């Protein structure tokens, strides 16, 4: 068992990463259904929460079926982070997470996300501001450092633990790498070998198969893994990893029927959450991901992108299923 404060997770939990415009309630619900043990919201601007910005407030939506769930906030101002932690607490998530890892320029330029990696003292102050403003367990997601010459994750891990966080997720790249090159998990291993580290350490970066998950779990001895991009359009990865850990065998790849069911559930939940029209418009970014590598889907993609009602959507699902059934690929 792995504990984050008072939150109990199974041995070697699998976490869904907080991903902007992806990790919303419908997607989290689907990942929970397919084996994710702990999920995080899309990251939320502390300044946006304080301004009561509609987009930021909408990201606070959480539901009992997805627990345990954490809400992730980011910012570079101590007072704003403190106030936003108090706002987050009002919706009663299980965890408050701080983003010190987002490498995107618009976030970094505000001195937030991975931008804070340049100033560990500020990182500690921001963390303490959140820890002291909530009774909920506080976790952090960060990177190895700003660039290869300033990797400071070993110092950061100790200082954030001392600041009161209950778990740390490390994306094993620097900010300058963005999402390029290979993640260097050796630093995660070094932190786990430090006898002064008592909090759970979760690894993140490049986990895209059950085989790699098992290899990295054995080689780097982390307490669990966070999965992000590999889950987009493929929520089955969580149960696939768990099954492989338990049996050493791979589950069959999802069939066309499995993929169509996942798309149906995702779209229905999206429509339920945001309204039929907007929910289906936001689904447009997901269709290609669910059918990545499936021959002839391009013929249906254009039609899916034009759907604006569930009635049209259901008709197109039936048409798609019939096409693949006739090709004996379902």
Model segments located where?
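Flavin-dependent oxidoreductase catalytic cores
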Residues: 1-330
